[in-house]
Amino acid sequence: MFLEIKGIKKSFGAGESHVDVLKGIDLEIEKGEFCVLLGPSGSGKSTLLNIIGGIDGADSGSITIQGEQLEDMKEKKLSLYRRKHLGYIFQMYNLIPNLTVRENIEVGAYLSDRPLDVDELLETLGLYEHQRKLPNQLSGGQQQRTAIGRAIVKNPDILLCDEPTGALDYNTSKEILKLIETVNHNYGNTIVMVTHNDAIKDMADRVVKLRDGMIRRNYQNEQKIPAADLEW
């Protein structure tokens, strides 16, 4: 199994402010699978994503990726693993303001010993003609495309997406979802996406519904819908 999650528990606070955010999560994700974590605010989906990405630690349980247990890694090895094998896309773009589109993407390439071709990626992203622009010269959709480029140029094994369309309008959101779909198809990255948008589940290979820190439903999507055909 490519990604195996066993018995993950996580809580925050103490005393009266103690909250159990994750209450024993078990989940398996295949290599190349597009998995959507769906649920309302406070369901634990973003916390789970952060634990998968090594950004946060679990109170108990284990995360195994390609046979390696994250909790067994020392901080230096974990940091190196994140840099080489994981890509992150967030709702906020977090681009470096004084670097061009191309330079922002190249930042990701420098972190990898097996980067994708930047020119080819710029074409895929629809950014080739904008590669010399600074972030403040771009639309929101173009900024998110640049952020996606920076994440995937590393050629990561896993792409972690936390509400990547949350700050975008309907049409731009669909363009970004089509791009993520293309990335999954062309490069074979395993994708784990957090969203509260129920419609996005229809383009996923696997749908995991969370509520109150527990998985309420986990199923494979037998009839996927292309991102271009999604409606909400």
What function would you assign to each model-found segment?
Residues 214-232:
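Conserved beta-strand-loop-alpha-helix hinge in the C-terminal portion
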Residues 2-204, 209:
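ABC family nucleotide-binding domain
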